[in-house]
Amino acid sequence: MSGNTLGLLFTVTTFGESHGPAIGAVVDGCPPGMALTEADIQGDLDRRRPGTSRHVTQRQEPDQVEILSGVFEGKTTGTPICLLIRNTDQRSKDYGNIVETFRPGHADYTYWQKYGIRDHRGGGRSSARLTAPVVAAGAVAKKWLREKYGTEIRGYMSQLGEIAVPFTDWSHVPENPFFAPNADIIPELETYMDALRRDGDSVGARIEVVASNVPVGLGEPLFDRLDADIAHAMMGINAVKGVEIGAGFDSVAQRGSVHGDELTAEGFRTNNSGGVLGGISTGQDVTVSLAIKPTSSIRTPRESIDKAGNAATVETFGRHDPCVGIRATPIAEAMLALVLIDHALRHRAQCGDVKVDTPRIPAQAGQTP
């Protein structure tokens, strides 16, 4: 199986399976000399960790990260950083009834057809459990971007099923299990999820991610555009079925006189571009929106086939997220960080000494550049 590595200069290769002894990532290309400990990584892993509320899978994994290499006396050495997370709460017997059948909407069928073998225990390599090492690697990238450029990457849930979540303030996001930026809507979301779990069904979600203080100039036209690489990475997250940058599909209904972000000496007037023009960052906030499909492992009986091609009925039991989008916010943040650090290092290598007389204007009119 190929396709396990993301990035060009700052690369992340993940390994492991959902019910194997451990999962992890090897981060290569991290600049040397950055202070790094497990504590720098653990915070984001705890945000993604399962079993933290009744609205997510009840699989109890501590997700304690171990740094096995690439750090000496508390600082990165520039050599590969191996991050290990041990699996401790596998319950493989829950998957005994799908050894010979394929879950509708899951990768069971495609993995079997492609490889002729599949690990049915928790989905094996196709499990959302494999987003944990991505979050760990993303925490390393976040730290470097923050220290080098002051870049901050934050995300929130803007929709759960058919319920829109209006944005009120960032301060609400860490205060609830949904990463919702609105405290008033939490009771409605909880009632909705409780009913969904009773019904044995699942639902999708929409996640927004914003990177602020992004340097101007990241991205390589034509085929290594920053927004193209962001979309590529985000589509690598389990269950993501759509990605928008900036105004996204709303651009279709906008006129050019509205969509084009006007530049003034005081800054950009709008940010319909999502912080990327011509595949290159503008210095504005990079804004990304993700559509996440409903979880495929549900108790509701559904039609399928077995390995022999015979008709079968599939019911999935065990501990599953009724909405994988609830824990997707730190994953999306990590993916954005991994793309940004890779392009930052590439930009520094090729264009680090480029100087122009035109001043950098603020990301938004009225702000300081």
UniProtKB/Swiss-Prot annotation:
GO terms for cellular component: cytosol. Reduced FMN (FMNH(2)). Pfam families: Chorismate_synt (PF01264). GO terms for molecular function: chorismate synthase activity; FMN binding. NADP(+) binds at residues 48, 54. HAMAP family: Chorismate_synth. Belongs to the chorismate synthase family. This is Chorismate synthase. It comes from Cupriavidus necator (strain ATCC 17699 / DSM 428 / KCTC 22496 / NCIMB 10442 / H16 / Stanier 337) (Ralstonia eutropha).
